[in-house]
Structure formats: structure tokens, C-alpha cells
């Protein structure tokens, strides 16, 4: 892979994976818009993208390292009968991870077909933007609660939202933030829960695809470099986003971007059909 293209793709992935704008959608749409060819049929494409996802997962683990240590301690303490907010939160994350994990394993091959029609991806990005706008309005009309106080049913509901992000164009972080808002979380707490919830899914997807990466000739070096670049971009992104939502940042801003970008992408690919 060309070095400049590798750097571009890695940074794009690291930023858009955490911003609620669909990383996979942008990874497919942006290069095509600028004439950067991605062979969607290449067997090494998905493993390479997953290597970038691993970089994101490590960035999230490092940023929330103190939080994860407390959650893990609370989880093991719960087996001894000592339940606290950290234990409750950890069990909520486990329950929330189940839906997307199961659906991803069962429908992975069928969902890959959507990658081949960029018009569908662009439409999904527009819908994602509309959902973010409604989610922002919803967040401002709900009573707020701490993420540790989410019921397990609410955590499962937030986890269900991740399923939509298996379709390129829909954002995992965006959909889970919207679901968190619906459950009564503040924008800041919904973002934190979303990032914590996404970490095991992103990490597990990478681990499952690693065998394909090792069997792709010449891809290991590219993947390692891409993973490091993505990790740096993702760390800077999560730090920015947490501060953004702490400062009363709004999902609606990202919703407007997704709608405008989706319309631009859709118009371009309708006028310039891409080979599938």
C-alpha cells in the first residue's frame, strides 16, 4: 500500500471511529470521492481495517485505563458478594456487549455485501445524521442519571444500538450515545458509556480477524504502522470528545455534518457510479 494513502486511511479511521460520523462509511466513501482506489474485493481489506480498529481499542484502553482497572476490580469483587457502582457498571457493559457480538458473528458475511454499494453507504450516513439530530433533542428532554445507575435492561437496549453500526454509514458511537440519551444519561456520561461499551467489541473484532491478516502477504508491516497511527489519532480524538461533551457539546453538530456529507457523497456517486 502506498505510504501516503496508508497514513491518510489510518488517521481517517482513528478520528472517525470515535466521532459519531461512521468510521467505516468514511473509510469507504472519502477515498472513492478523491479517486483513491480501494479494492473492495481484496481479501486483505477487512483484516487491514480491523488492524486499524485494534489501534483504536488500545487507545481507548489507555485513555480509560484507571476506569477499567476500577471496573475490573469491582467485577471480581462482585463474586465475593461485594457489589458497588463499579461492579454494576461492569456487568452493565458485559450485558450491553452481547447483542452486537452475537449479530456480528452471525451476519458478518451478509453485511460485507453492503460495502460494495457506496450509494447505500451514503444514504445510511444521511440517516445517521438525522438520528443524531433527534438524539440531541431527546437528550435535552430527559432526566439525567449516572451511568452506574443504568438498569441492566437499559444497558442491553444501548447494546442493541450497536447492531445498526454493523452497516457502513451508521456510527457505533453515535447510535449508542443516542440510546444512552434515551436512557437518561447526560451527553458526557453517554459518551463515556459508549466508548467503554465499544472497546470490547472493537478489540474482539480485531482479534477474530488477526488470522486473516497474518495470511495476507505483505500486509503485516502496513497493519502495524497503520495500527500505531490510528491509535495516536484515536487517543487525541477521545480526549477531544470527552472535553467537548463535558463542555455541553451537542450531537446535533455532528448530525448536520453527516447529512451534508451524505448528500454530497450520494450526489457524487449517482453522477459517477463506482464499480462493484
From Swiss-Prot:
- Keyword Membrane in the entry? The reply is yes
What membrane topology is given? Multi-pass membrane protein
Q: Which GO MF terms are attached to this record?
A: undecaprenyl-diphosphatase activity
Protein's recorded name? Undecaprenyl-diphosphatase 2
Give the keywords, sorted: Antibiotic resistance, Cell inner membrane, Cell membrane, Cell shape, Cell wall biogenesis/degradation, Hydrolase, Membrane, Peptidoglycan synthesis, Transmembrane, Transmembrane helix
What catalytic activity is recorded? di-trans,octa-cis-undecaprenyl diphosphate + H2O = di-trans,octa-cis-undecaprenyl phosphate + phosphate + H(+)
Q: Which residue ranges traverse the bilayer?
A: 5-27, 44-64, 87-107, 114-134, 150-170, 190-210, 218-238, 251-271
Q: Which organism is it from?
A: Paraburkholderia xenovorans (strain LB400)
Please name the gene that encodes this protein: uppP2
EC numbers for this chain: 3.6.1.27
